Regions:
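Sec/Tat signal peptide C-region and signal peptidase I cleavage site
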Residues: 17-23
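Short, basic/low-complexity N-terminal boundary segments at the transition from targeting/disordered tails
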Residues: 15, 65-78, 128-141
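Accessory structured domains or lobes within enzymes
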Residues: 29, 126, 132-199
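A contiguous strand-loop segment
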Residues: 23-117, 149-152
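Positively charged n-region of N-terminal signal peptides that target proteins for export
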Residues: 1-4
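Second-shell loop/turn segments in exported
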Residues: 111-115, 123-129
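Bacterial N-terminal signal peptides
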Residues: 6-16
Length: 199
């Protein structure tokens, strides 16, 4: 008889437990000449592919408006983790040492294509890995492409010189933190400014 109240109490308390969080985090640990780039990935599904992307491949963005689709030829080869097919990476590392990964960011608002060539946001990630060797290059060119996507993400980018940057698209423009403005090379599912307040 005593088991029934204990069981009912246990079931009632179980309903009060918080739900699991979808909380991705990407980081770069740096010490002396060593850097380790890592990520935990909590998402609704976990299937994916490791893809080898060759240099010298001509590419066209897969957009519903082909006239605005960006075209480029990959300058660097890379290895990426893709869940949605070739050319749509969640993150990766190119042969020049540029590493990039993404996290969900609900407040993302991308730049409109306007008169610029455009890509999907996952293609934006592949474009960076295909074309740039350094964080400085990514930062200088972050706003050159329009982005057409329903996926709301932001990026942590690091290079073999141990430079890192966050790239977020807020209010239709790129917002970058690097150098002294990036005291902790880590990113989660909030803007970098919000994350700094958690310290």
């Amino acid at each position: 008889m005593r088991r029934v109240p204990v069981l009912l109490l246990t079931l009632a308390l179980t309903g009060l437990l918080p739900p699991p969080a979808d909380a991705c985090t990407t980081f770069c640990l740096r010490k002396d000449a060593t850097a380790v780039f890592g990520k935990n990935y909590d998402w609704h599904f976990d299937d994916g592919l490791v893809v080898v992307n060759k240099r010298g491949v001509t590419k066209t963005a897969a957009l519903p408006l082909p006239a605005r689709a960006a075209k480029w030829t990959s300058k660097y080869g890379s290895v990426t983790f893709n869940q949605f097919g070739r050319e749509f990476p969640n993150g990766g590392l190119n042969e020049a040492g540029l590493a990039l990964d993404l996290m969900w960011l609900e407040s993302t608002r991308y730049p409109t294509p306007a008169d610029r060539p455009a890509v999907d946001v996952l293609e934006w990630a592949q474009y960076q890995l295909d074309n740039y060797a350094t964080v400085d290059e990514v930062v200088r060119n972050a706003g050159n492409l329009g982005i057409v996507s329903d996926g709301k993400v932001h990026f942590l980018v690091c290079d073999k010189g141990r430079s890192c940057a966050t790239v977020e698209f807020l209010d239709g423009r790129p917002v970058v933190h690097t150098g002294a403005a990036l005291p902790a090379p880590a990113l989660a599912n909030h803007t970098y400014e919000e994350l700094l307040r958690f310290q």
